From Swiss-Prot:
Similarity annotation: Belongs to the bacterial ribosomal protein bL33 family.
Entry's Gene Ontology cellular component terms: cytosolic large ribosomal subunit
Keyword DNA-binding: no
PANTHER family per the UniProt record, alphabetical: 54S RIBOSOMAL PROTEIN L39, MITOCHONDRIAL, LARGE RIBOSOMAL SUBUNIT PROTEIN BL33M
Keywords, in A-Z order: Ribonucleoprotein, Ribosomal protein
NCBIfam families xref list: PRK00595.1, rpmG_bact
GO biological processes: translation
Organism: Xanthobacter autotrophicus (strain ATCC BAA-1158 / Py2)
HAMAP family according to UniProt: Ribosomal_bL33
Alphabetized InterPro entries for the sequence: Ribosomal_bL33, Ribosomal_bL33_CS, Ribosomal_bL33_sf, Ribosomal_zn-bd
Protein name, per record: Large ribosomal subunit protein bL33
Length: 55
């Protein structure tokens, strides 16, 4: 059985509020860490969310 190409990742807020989004990415084509600007409802602003592993 082959290994799955897509993995689930957690996007954690860089504002240290504990807010996170869960998404998936293709680990074979996207080898670098994902950084996206998304909305953080705690600080009520758009901030950078960085990829971390789901534990």
């Amino acid at each position: 059985m082959a290994k799955a190409a897509t993995i689930k990742i957690k996007l954690l807020s860089s504002a240290d509020t504990g807010v996170f989004y869960v998404t998936k990415k293709n680990s074979r084509t996207k080898t670098d860490k994902i950084v996206l600007k998304k909305y953080d409802p705690v600080v009520r602003k758009h901030v950078e969310f960085r990829e971390t592993k789901i534990k």
